[in-house]
């Protein structure tokens, strides 16, 4: 008997465990320097969950790793549109904006991430990016 639950909002029935495995596979391919395979997996998850920010954040990470900062920003912004309450999505927007040298906009997104979930890993990441701004990393 499976202890995994079906994922709500999926276009076809898929269990949480299977979705997690797909995402982990996509990240593994990314680590193995196989971005095409990673993109195929993340795009497949996006097709399964068209209303979830999770695949958008995965695509953000993929584009970011490839140095495609405008595409990373677009995916992160789409994640925010899908879930405005996601600190991770706001932090991802802030990070992409920093690498595009759009510091004032980045600060706004980072502050939003921190205010949404102050004790979360996303907020900690946003705080670290704010510190990097302060010491001139993105100048």
Regions found by a protein language model. Give the residues of each.
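Mid-chain, well-packed structural core segment of small domains
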Residues: 69-104
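Register position in tetratricopeptide repeats
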Residues: 31, 65-66, 99, 132-136
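Start-of-helix register in tetratricopeptide repeats
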Residues: 20, 54, 88, 121-125
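TPR-adjacent "capping" and linker segments in tetratricopeptide-repeat scaffold/adaptor proteins
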Residues: 3-20
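Structural signature of alpha-solenoid helical repeat scaffolds
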Residues: 13-14, 47, 81, 118-121
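Alpha-helical adaptor scaffolds
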Residues: 19-83
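TPR/TPR-like (Sel1-like) alpha-helical repeat modules
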Residues: 98-121, 127-134
């Amino acid at each position: 008997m499976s202890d995994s639950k079906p994922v709500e909002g999926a276009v076809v029935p898929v269990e949480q465990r299977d979705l997690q495995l797909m995402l982990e596979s996509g990240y593994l391919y990314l680590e193995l320097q196989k971005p095409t395979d990673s993109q195929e997996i993340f795009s497949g998850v996006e097709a399964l969950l068209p209303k979830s920010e999770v695949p958008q954040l995965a695509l953000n990470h993929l584009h970011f790793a490839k140095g495609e900062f405008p595409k990373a920003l677009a995916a992160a912004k789409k994640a925010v549109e899908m879930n405005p309450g996601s600190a991770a999505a706001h932090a991802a927007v802030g990070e992409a904006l920093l690498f595009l040298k759009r510091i004032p906009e980045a600060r706004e997104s980072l502050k939003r991430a921190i205010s949404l979930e102050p004790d979360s890993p996303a907020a900690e990441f946003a705080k670290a990016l704010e510190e990097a701004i302060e010491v001139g990393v993105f100048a």
